[in-house]
Amino acid sequence: MFFRILALLPLVFLVTAHSLVSRSDVVVPVCNAISNMNTTAIALQNACTNFEAQPTNDMAMPIMKFGFALEGEISSGINVCPSDVLSSGDTEILFNALKDLYDTIQKLVSSILKLKDAIIAAGYEAQSCFAVEMMATSMTTFMDKVYACSANEYKGPLDEMRSGVLTMMAQANFSYCGTVSPRGSSKISGVEI
């Protein structure tokens, strides 16, 4: 009887160890999506910088192009974000990837807010409102999904990051569209302006 129990120990160890190991097959697609969002957000920020230097219709077009591309990247991130709770190791990897995106989004929203009058003067008020609404809605959904799948020990820092991103998106949406959320309320996922 004793030897039968000993024979089962390696199996129990392997099953337990497997559940504790990071599942890179789950987190890599999300990190790739975050990397793509970051790259596209930087391209959008560069387009904003170019438009600021030369506010013409030709320079406004890349802003629209990269704005819609960023919304597409965010949607891809929503699609690959797992619904199961990640391990601590996977959540740490995800959190580190999100820190870079957070910094980029801060700079991007600052640029977008600064250019509002010039973009409206170029005749892109309706398109800008639509693009910002789509981005705010998608980013809210993405951050909510990331928060939901994260390990408990990262919930605090992720909630701060999520609130920061949602506040930035709400500010941009309010600036361009006059409402905080696409449905006209003064809230985006619990964040008020």
From Swiss-Prot:
Protein keywords: Cell wall, Glycoprotein, Secreted, Signal
Localization of this protein: Secreted, Cell wall
GO cellular component terms, semicolon-separated: extracellular region
Glycosylation: residue positions: N38, N173
Induction: Shows high expression in fruiting bodies and is highly expressed throughout development.
Signal peptide coordinates: 1-17
Primary localization class, coarse: secreted
Top-level taxon of origin: Eukaryota
Post-translational modifications reported in the UniProt record: Galactomannoprotein, glycosylated.
Purpose: Constitutive protein of the cell wall.
Extra remark beyond the main annotation: Armillaria species are both devastating forest pathogens and some of the largest and oldest terrestrial organisms on Earth. They forage for hosts and achieve immense colony sizes via rhizomorphs, root-like multicellular structures of clonal dispersal. An A.ostoyae colony, known as the 'humongous fungus' in the Malheur National Forest in the Strawberry Mountains of eastern Oregon, was found to be the largest fungal colony in the world, spanning an area of 9.1 square kilometers. This organism is estimated to be some 8,000 years old and may weigh as much as 35,000 tons.
Protein family per UniProt: Belongs to the cell wall mannoprotein 1 family.
Name used for this protein in its record: Cell wall galactomannoprotein
Organism: Armillaria ostoyae
Lineage: Eukaryota, Fungi, Dikarya, Basidiomycota, Agaricomycotina
